[in-house]
């Protein structure tokens, strides 16, 4: 889990727009966040396997 202070800091509006960054809404991870879901790759994988993300399927080719 991310530190609560860093999660709160990310939620605040920054002084300059370029300083804003995305964090996972579920665990607070700052890297590898999917904008479409607002989740990190790990949480997307866990939720997709559990069937909690509608419209997401395991690819096969």
From Swiss-Prot:
Zn(2+) binds at residues 24, 27, 40, 43. The keyword Cell inner membrane does not apply. GO terms for cellular component: cytoplasm; small ribosomal subunit. Pfam families: Ribosomal_S14 (PF00253). GO terms for biological process: translation. Keywords: Metal-binding, Ribonucleoprotein, Ribosomal protein, RNA-binding, rRNA-binding, Zinc. Binds 1 zinc ion per subunit. Its cofactor is Zn(2+). GO terms for molecular function: rRNA binding; structural constituent of ribosome; zinc ion binding. Transmembrane segments: none annotated. NCBIfam families: PRK08061.1 (NF005974). Belongs to the universal ribosomal protein uS14 family. Zinc-binding uS14 subfamily. Binds 16S rRNA, required for the assembly of 30S particles and may also be responsible for determining the conformation of the 16S rRNA at the A site. Part of the 30S ribosomal subunit. Contacts proteins S3 and S10. This is Small ribosomal subunit protein uS14. It comes from Rhodococcus erythropolis (strain PR4 / NBRC 100887). The gene is rpsZ.
């Amino acid at each position: 889990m991310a530190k609560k202070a860093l999660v709160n800091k990310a939620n605040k509006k920054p002084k300059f727009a370029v300083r804003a960054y995305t964090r996972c809404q579920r665990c607070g991870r700052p890297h590898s966040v999917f904008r479409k879901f607002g989740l990190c790759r790990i949480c997307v994988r866990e939720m997709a396997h559990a069937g909690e993300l509608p419209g997401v399927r395991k690819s096969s080719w």
